[in-house]
A protein has these predicted regions:
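AlphaC helix of the protein kinase catalytic domain
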Residues: 14-23
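Conserved short submotifs of the Hanks-type protein kinase catalytic core
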Residues: 1-12
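Conserved activation segment of eukaryotic-like protein kinases, specifically the C-terminal portion
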Residues: 84-94
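Activation segment signature within eukaryotic-like protein kinase domains
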Residues: 31-32
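Conserved catalytic-loop aspartate of Hanks-type protein kinases
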Residues: 109
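Catalytic-loop of the protein kinase fold
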Residues: 43-59
Length: 139
């Protein structure tokens, strides 16, 4: 058995943000537009991504993005009101309904898209705190 992976020499958006601190509006618009198209495609195939963050978005040699790490994705989500009570995701990117242990659906991906846009323009997630309890309260 062989595992073939695409090499992305330009790294991920987490690395790019660490280097640049934030993106200009034009670059943020391009990246967000491509992530939006990727999410639309996933949702059309009934996939809820659930772990959208800069570290899970790779850059290719032409400046376009690729989503990676589908480990937290949920298949066969055919409704925006899918009942999933799983507590999954990265702390600074968790949607309020996940923290409240409520059922959630594909809408958590759209929440994460907003968090991502904020981070691209400001340089950190909107409710970021080093203390986990404070972070959760802010969300």
């Amino acid at each position: 058995m062989f595992l073939v992976l695409e090499y992305k020499e330009f790294g991920d958006l987490g690395q790019a943000l660490a280097k640049e601190r934030l993106f200009g509006e034009e670059l943020a618009r391009i990246y967000i537009s491509e992530v939006l198209l990727a999410l639309e495609y996933l949702h059309s195939k009934n996939v809820m991504y659930r772990d959208l963050k800069p570290d899970n978005i790779m850059l290719d040699g032409t400046g376009h993005i690729r989503l990676i790490d589908f480990g937290l994705s949920k298949l066969n989500v055919d409704s925006d009101n899918y009942s999933s009570g799983s507590f999954l995701g990265s702390h600074a990117y968790l949607a309020p309904e996940i923290l409240a242990s409520k059922s959630y659906g594909k809408s958590v991906d759209w929440y994460n898209l907003g968090v991502l846009l904020y981070e691209f323009l400001v340089g950190q997630p909107p409710y970021y705190k080093n203390d986990l309890e404070e972070l959760y309260q802010n969300i």
